[in-house]
Amino acid sequence: MENRWQVMIVWQVDRMRIRTWNSLVKHHMYISGKAKGWIYKHHYESTNPRVSSEVQIPLGDARLVITTYWGLHTGERDWHLGQGVSMEWRTRRYSTQVDPDLADQLIHLYYFDCFSESAIRNAILGHIVSPRCEYQAGHSKVGSLQYLALTALIKPKKIKPPLPSVKKLTEDRWNKPQKTKGHRGSHTMNGH
């Protein structure tokens, strides 16, 4: 029988970012209580020897699974140390990979207090609303003018330690798109 390969998108991540992510997740699961219901699995609880940790985040009937890996093939540079992370959205019989922005948005739909756009209408109607958003990483677009005005009045409160953001976990120098040099900076185009 031949080998069957499964291709996954794995974001290359610095080892220290993975340690920080795991620490933040465990802090908010066990100490602050903001990540209630999240499941943290250690490397020894996985059958895959490449998995270093797994965080399962319940999202209604589905769940978001953030898996960190070690011992992967290194990248082009010396600092690509073979560490990585993948994000997967799973429901009963279906799963798909998601990017860090979408992962943060999915987390924010179910967790952490937020001052959302619907709060503007509620504030106008005289209802009590949450004054700030705890999880800024869950917002990817610029809000309406009213939303921006209200957020300018009420500064976001810094939470120590910060809430775990998947986007922040994958944010690194080798995951950013490469900037190409202009005509002046390219040696091959100048003939030098």
Swiss-Prot record:
Residues modified as Phosphothreonine are 96, 188
Cellular component (GO) terms are: host cell cytoplasm; host cell plasma membrane; membrane; virion component
Q: Where is this region: SOCS box-like?
A: 151-180
In the record, biological process GO terms are: viral life cycle
The segment annotated Membrane association runs over 171-172
Give the bilayer topology: Peripheral membrane protein
The short motif HCCH motif is annotated over 108-139
UniProt keyword terms in alphabetical order = AIDS, Host cell membrane, Host cytoplasm, Host membrane, Host-virus interaction, Membrane, Metal-binding, Phosphoprotein, RNA-binding, Ubl conjugation, Ubl conjugation pathway, Virion, Zinc
Region described as Multimerization: 151-164
The Swiss-Prot or TrEMBL record annotates one GO molecular function as: RNA binding
Q: Is the keyword Nuclease in the record? A: no
Where are the stretches annotated RNA-binding?
75-114
Primary place of residence? host cell
Which residue intervals make up region (Disordered)?
Answer: 164-192
Q: Where is this motif: BC-box-like motif?
A: 144-153
Q: What free text does the record give on domains?
A: The BC-like-box motif mediates the interaction with elongin BC complex.
Q: What does this protein do?
A: Counteracts the innate antiviral activity of host APOBEC3F and APOBEC3G by promoting their ubiquitination and degradation. Acts as a substrate recognition component of an E3 ubiquitin-protein ligase complex: mechanistically, Vif hijacks a host cullin-5-RING E3 ubiquitin-protein ligase complex (ECS complex) and the transcription coactivator CBFB/CBF-beta to form an active E3 ubiquitin-protein ligase complex that targets APOBEC3G and APOBEC3F for polyubiquitination, leading to their degradation by the proteasome.
Identify its protein family. Answer: Belongs to the primate lentivirus group Vif protein family.
Task: Print the miscellaneous field.
Answer: Vif-defective viruses show catastrophic failure in reverse transcription due to APOBEC-induced mutations that initiate a DNA base repair pathway and compromise the structural integrity of the ssDNA. In the absence of Vif, the virion is morphologically abnormal. HIV-1 lineages are divided in three main groups, M (for Major), O (for Outlier), and N (for New, or Non-M, Non-O). The vast majority of strains found worldwide belong to the group M. Group O seems to be endemic to and largely confined to Cameroon and neighboring countries in West Central Africa, where these viruses represent a small minority of HIV-1 strains. The group N is represented by a limited number of isolates from Cameroonian persons. The group M is further subdivided in 9 clades or subtypes (A to D, F to H, J and K).
This protein's name: Virion infectivity factor
Name of the gene encoding the protein in the UniProt record? vif
